[in-house]
């Protein structure tokens, strides 16, 4: 069973951004968008060799999160993104005049009555 370990609100005004980071000691991480934004959340695989280009162009119609070391998602209002906490992610600079607002959270596995993880 997973439980929320922490939860917080992000209010990114014009010019605000977040650099690449991970969420250690978590089972899952997520973000729920309360507003739309043209500026994406960006993901980067933690293993450098995955981030270097090694796919054969002849086999790739278009790059996506399954065949790339980096990708992005443009936030849409009322959208929930859940991702592994070890996945590097950052938020692009908000260049809009309105605030970008989201709720982020992490989960952990709940210990059983003997203090052990299931």
Language-model features, listed with the residues they occupy:
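Residues that flank catalytic or metal-binding motifs in active/ligand-binding sites
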Residues: 5, 26-28, 37, 99, ...
